[in-house]
Amino acid sequence: MQRLATIAPPQVHEIWALLSQIPDPEIPVLTITDLGMVRNVTQMGEGWVIGFTPTYSGCPATEHLIGAIREAMTTNGFTPVQVVLQLDPAWTTDWMTPDARERLREYGISPPAGHSCHAHLPPEVRCPRCASVHTTLISEFGSTACKALYRCDSCREPFDYFKCI
């Protein structure tokens, strides 16, 4: 996420707050800023440029989210606005805020374990319901491409795990 310098125009702070209200359509308890999808907010002349990185390049919600950003900006008088799709570097779960990880757990989805640079290591996947680490992978593919399906061996409940990407 862009660090806000003390010399940033006051509207930049307002825009970050505005964008932090746009929910992710697949996980509505998280916003696009919680996930780290908004990379930067820049004033360019009389308008605004928003850097946006989807969670993966084929994400079906990309156009919807770009439209939501444009609508929020326009509705609140921040025009003209240009949303720049930034695919490099690719989005990573490392960009998620700590608060987002906790809200995932409260929502019933086990948050990503570890960091993306260690994604090849088998993670200790904790059950979001009972906090047990005695879990079993059922399927690499869960309800969305970024999730895997697990079952807790302690409470026997199935749950989604947000893959470390």
Swiss-Prot record:
Superkingdom classification of source: Bacteria
Pathway(s): Aromatic compound metabolism; phenylacetate degradation
Alphabetical list of InterPro entries matching this protein: Fe-S_Maturation_MIP18 (IPR052339), FSCA_dom_sf (IPR034904), MIP18-like (IPR002744), PaaD-like (IPR011883), Zn_ribbon_PaaD (IPR056572)
Function of the protein: Possible component of 1,2-phenylacetyl-CoA epoxidase multicomponent enzyme system which catalyzes the reduction of phenylacetyl-CoA (PA-CoA) to form 1,2-epoxyphenylacetyl-CoA. The subunit D may have a function related to the maturation of the monooxygenase complex, rather than direct involvement in catalysis. PaaD could assist either in maturation of PaaE or PaaA.
Protein name: Putative 1,2-phenylacetyl-CoA epoxidase, subunit D
UniProt cross-references to Gene3D superfamilies, sorted A to Z: Fe-S cluster assembly (FSCA)
Induction field: Activated by cAMP receptor protein (CRP), integration host factor (IHF) and by phenylacetyl-coenzyme A (PA-CoA) that prevents PaaX from binding its target sequences. Inhibited by PaaX.
This protein's encoding gene: paaD
Subunit architecture: Monomer.
GO BP, sorted A to Z: phenylacetate catabolic process
NCBIfam families assigned to the protein according to its UniProt record, in alphabetical order: PA_CoA_Oxy4
Note: PaaD component is not essential for the reaction in vitro.
